[in-house]
């Protein structure tokens, strides 16, 4: 098969706001180094390159470069098929600050409350991350009121002369949704009621995103499961109903501990303990400890 081709050089063409070396340090792909024998990051991977390009894009968009684009990428290999060369051509564009942010649409929650969730403020350098966090927070707040499928999008208006951007956050709550049924599966040992008593969302009640998240957290904290997944798929044929699907993967909850000791007065002593955190799937904890020591007998 021969030797695996290694990345000989990576070039980023068009970078001015940041040093090329700084941008290269953000990427997973790199030229051979003292750790690349283990990470294999000096071997070309289309998937890794796609991830690196997204990292570059996020780096610029989170620092004000709203019009940043990756124009092209070229990957070439040397005639002897030993060296790989990667060239990324970018256009940075201007750096934008935020001039204003306003809310529009059907809010259903006091506007002042939603405005407080906006993390991007006038006068600040534009950040895609902060903008996405803002729209997500508004969507989640509406979800707490039953609007599980709310659409919240930010429409930009650029002033290229002033290098400023104004955003209008458009809010469409959609229909209010309630939880039709709660289904639990995967609990081969733990009883249904042990899981259900941890739930904060109830059946036939309005969807509440916060209560649903708390429900998943509480089930996970029981400590009986390796995995806990919670999904809320729409009920087919309806526009205002979802089911809450909880899937768990059981894990061992019992422990057996054995030990032995030696002393001049008692020679050999034996200790043992058996604990079960989820007795017969009931959620009850039981433990038994035994010691043969004359000075300290425990049953």
Where in this protein do the model-derived segments appear?
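Periplasmic polypeptide-binding modules associated with outer-membrane biogenesis and secretion
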Residues: 1-264, 273, 287-298
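Short conserved beta-strand segments at catalytic cores or DNA/RNA-binding microdomains
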Residues: 275-277
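Short loop/turn motifs that connect adjacent beta-strands in outer-membrane beta-barrel proteins
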Residues: 279-285
